[in-house]
Structure formats: C-alpha cells, structure tokens
Swiss-Prot record:
Entry-linked InterPro entries: Class_I_gatase-like, CobQ/CobB/MinD/ParA_Nub-bd_dom, CobQ_GATase1, CobQ_N, CobQ_synth, GATase_3, P-loop_NTPase
Cysteine pairs bridged by disulfides in the record: none
SUPFAM superfamilies in UniProt: Class I glutamine amidotransferase-like, P-loop containing nucleoside triphosphate hydrolases
CDD domains: CobQ_N, GATase1_CobQ
Keywords: Cobalamin biosynthesis, Glutamine amidotransferase
Species lineage: Bacteria, Bacillati, Cyanobacteriota, Cyanophyceae, Acaryochloridales
Name of the molecule in the record: Cobyric acid synthase
A GO molecular function held by the record: ABC-type vitamin B12 transporter activity
Encoding gene (name): cobQ
Pathway in which this enzyme or protein is active: Cofactor biosynthesis; adenosylcobalamin biosynthesis
Amino acid sequence: MGAIMVVGTTSHAGKSIMAAVICRMLKRKGYQVTPFKGQNMALNAYVTNAGDEIGHAQAVQAWAAGLEPRVEMNPILLKPQGDMTSQVILNGKAVGRTQAADYYRDYFDRGWQAITTALVTLQQEFDWIVCEGAGSPAEINLKHRDLTNMRVAKHLNAPTLLVADIDRGGVFAHIVGTLELLDPDERALIKGFVINKFRGQRSLLESGITWLEERTGIPVVGVIPWLEHSLPAEDSLDLFERRRTKPNAEVTIAVIRLPRISNFTDFDPLEAEPSVRLQFVGPNQPLGQPDAVIVPGSKTTISDLQQLQVSSMADQLRAYSQAGGMVLGICGGLQMLGQTISDPMGTEGPPGEFAGLGLLPLQTTMSGDKITRQRQAQITLPSDCSALGEDARTIQGYEIHQGQTQVLQPEAVQAWFDDPALGVVSCNHRILGTYLHGIFNNGPWRRVWLNQLRAQKNLLPLPLAIPNYKVYRDHMLDQVTDAIAPYLNLQPFLGKA
C-alpha cells in the first residue's frame, strides 16, 4: 500500500481537484486507488449507497478513482450551522451539534479513532490512498488538534505535496512560510511543491523556482496553468468566484443565494448546459425577471427563511409567482415554499413556528431524526410523463434533510413522483418542490424542464436523448486530468508506480 498526502498553503489552493486528478492518474496506471479526507468542513454533502453522509468533494474523488463513494473516504464531516456552530457527521451519521470551542474537547479522540479505523480498512483494500488535507497545515494555533493534515501524513508516513495558488499572489511567501511553521518531522514529509492556477509563460517563473528549490531543497513538481472547468466546487466561495459568463445563453435561471446554501452541486448540470445562464441572487438584491427561480437547500432552513422575510426577497418571490413565474424549491427550499415550518424541539435553533413563503400548501415539522438515503423514483406528473419516454421516467437522487412535510390542501397540488412525500407541483405547474437532491443530474428530465422554460420564449426545444450528468462529469474528470497531467511530475511520490 502506498499513500500520498495533498496539502495546501491556503484554503482554495486547489487540493480537491489535485487529489481527484492524482486518483485518476493512478487509476489509469491500473492501480486500485481511493481518496481520503479525515475531516471535511462543507455544506456540500453526498449520500452513499449505504445511506452515509460524506463530503461531496470526496464523492467526486471517488468517481475519479472509478469507485462508488463510501463513508471510509471521509469519516468526519462538519456542516456549519452558524458562525460558531456545526453539525457533526461521524462515520456518516449525524451525532450532534457543537460549538467551535467545544469540538476538540468532545470529539478529538473519537474523531482520530474514526480516522485511523477508516484508514486500516482502506489500506487492506487499495494499492494507493490519496489523502487531502484541509485549509493550511501550518495553523500554529490549531496544529496540536489538527485531525486532517500532517497528523494523517505522519500516521501513514506519506510523501506530501504542497499546493499553492499563485493567482492570489505571494506564492513564494506562502510556500516558504508554510514550511517554516511546520515541525521538522512534518517538513521532512514535504517532497514537492505545485504552483497552481498560473497565467502566463513558465519562463517568467524560472528565477523564483530556482531560488525556492535552492532555499528549501524541495523540487517544484508542477506549474499548473489556470483551467476553466465545470467540476463541482468545494464550497460557496469557489462556486460564486468561478461562474462563467454566457453571452449566448437563451434561458436565465436565478438561484437564491441563501446565507447557508447547501448542496449547490445540484446546479452543476444546469451550469453545464450551454444555453443556460445561472444567476445567484442575494436576499437583498433585485430578483429581476428570470425565466425560473430556484430556492436551494439550506443547512439552517429557518434562519435562511427569516433572512428572506426580513429582506425584500420574500416579497419579490411572491410577486414573481403571482405574475406567473416558475419557482422550484429543493429540500430546504421546498420547506420554505410552504405555509409554515415548526421546530418544536429546537432542532435548528430556538423552538417555534415560522411563517413560510406561502407558495405551496405545505406544513413542515422539524425533528431530530435525519433522513439520508439514495432514492429512485418514478415521475408521475402527467405533463412530464407525456414528454418523457417510459424508460426516462425513472430518476435518481438522494435525500438529506431533517423534518417531515405534510400537504394541507391535497386538491391544490399534484404528486410529482410515485412517492408523494418526495415532491409536489401546484395545479398550474408553476410552483414545484422536491426533497430530491441531484434531480438535475437526470438528463432527459432536465431537458424537459428546460424546454418548458424555452416554450415560454418561443424557443425551439432541446433534444431529450442525452445521457445523465454522470457521463458528462466523468468526461470532465478526464479532461481536467489530461490538462494537468503533462505539468505534474509525480515520480518523487510514486517511485516505481
């Protein structure tokens, strides 16, 4: 068994993509390879086939390795619920909420046990483990309780790749400063540097690279050019920074930028559609006149709903709906579209009942039980069924939510799926809500929905005979790997591999 650790000088240096690319490169060499991240903090989650919740970035890395995601790849997931509070997902299951000051006191030992147990399992099954760190490995105020970076590297005696983002400036200072703050035994594991997101000619960097290698004795094993790609973003900062302009887009879809937006990977398939422009609209921004509005998932549904209510967005959404606009709510967005959300046990915060947006006759009650499961459902909505062939009416996705939703006026809505609890549609088909994450991954249905928007503008329909998004995602993983591999020398890490 071999192991490689990928750490970064900062957050957003490109660790996740680099780890995915290394997984793909090793897979191409014929090795059994698995990704691993001991602890992730993210609001983008994925549910494995076993019903376990892990970071979505590790799911992407698993697909890069040709694997189905599993809980051992990310035994700890922290999902921020407020500035100082997170939900703790341990071995795929929610085990509680914690304050930042209490987390390491309450979970450090349990967390390290989960990490080492997962590593033992993976070591027994795979030729290579590609580990990803988090943030920076040199946060000196946190190093003594860091579960993710050099503690894992030392445990595996893993040669470590240090990735730095030159696009942010100060790349040489970041690299040297990080090395200076590492302990000697940690520094000894750093076997190469990657300068990521470089724009320009490498010759302009040569003097700096020579200086860096002479000063540190460590080679620069890669200078990676700036890449445009559509692989899922790690968090919302990445997401909003990289949105591409599409001057020739024919359909505009507004996504409400909730303060605690979660699972925004739901929209990657829409971003990949050449004819679709996505706009992320904050609660205090003008909504405008998009062709459709999506209210996405949220880690703190009630708090984000209240933000919509105190801002202008709730009124804007109601006015948009009354004017005939199409609104789709996903997971927490579905809950917000209803009449009320009650939280009698204080699952998300102070107990109480809270007014929803009132666009669907629904009532949601929060509870301590969390639903995490893969789902396969049959579309039963007549308008969708008439457009889809029988084979394309089966769609796949996953649920991650707390709370149960009831329909208050059954005559005012139609069931969207063969399981009515998964989603409903208003009788005029302009307001839709579903608990199903990943619904846009289903290519034919995505095109049916987009064609409804196109028909509003007298645009020709898009063809429905397309594969699901996972085929496109796999193609993108190949493209990104093909773009990075020529600039990345892994021999110092792989030896004879």
